[in-house]
């Protein structure tokens, strides 16, 4: 089970990323636009650097919804491998069954 502070930190990162999403996209488009002057592009780089670190989507980590475990996360279910297995064995995930050959 992940610490509550780690889960809260992840929620904070998601909120910040959503808050600054449009502004970050606009600045990144300005930076990559070669038709603009070098000075305008450099100003956009400096503005982007002022944003909070946690507002970057790449700082987010996928975590299990039930336990908060960051490793062995399965995107399809939003759970870690351990919780997917438990749910599958209980029959809580429709159409998922244990493989046998």
From Swiss-Prot:
The keyword Lipoprotein does not apply. InterPro entries: Ribosomal_uS14, Ribosomal_uS14_bac/plastid, Ribosomal_uS14_CS. It holds the Pfam family Ribosomal_S14. SUPFAM superfamilies: Glucocorticoid receptor-like (DNA-binding domain). GO terms for molecular function: rRNA binding; structural constituent of ribosome. Keywords: Ribonucleoprotein, Ribosomal protein, RNA-binding, rRNA-binding. Gene3D superfamilies: 1.10.287.1480. GO terms for biological process: translation. Binds 16S rRNA, required for the assembly of 30S particles and may also be responsible for determining the conformation of the 16S rRNA at the A site. This is Small ribosomal subunit protein uS14. It comes from Buchnera aphidicola subsp. Schizaphis graminum (strain Sg).
């Amino acid at each position: 089970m992940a610490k509550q502070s780690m889960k809260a930190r992840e929620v904070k990162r998601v909120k910040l990323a959503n808050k600054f999403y449009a502004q970050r996209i606009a600045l990144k488009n300005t930076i990559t636009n070669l038709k603009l002057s070098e000075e305008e592009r450099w100003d956009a780089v400096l503005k982007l650097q002022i944003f909070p670190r946690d507002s970057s989507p790449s700082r987010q980590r996928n975590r299990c919804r039930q336990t908060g475990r960051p490793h062995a996360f399965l995107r399809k279910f939003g759970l870690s491998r351990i919780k997917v297995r438990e749910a599958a064995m209980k029959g809580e995930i429709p159409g998922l069954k244990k493989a046998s050959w």
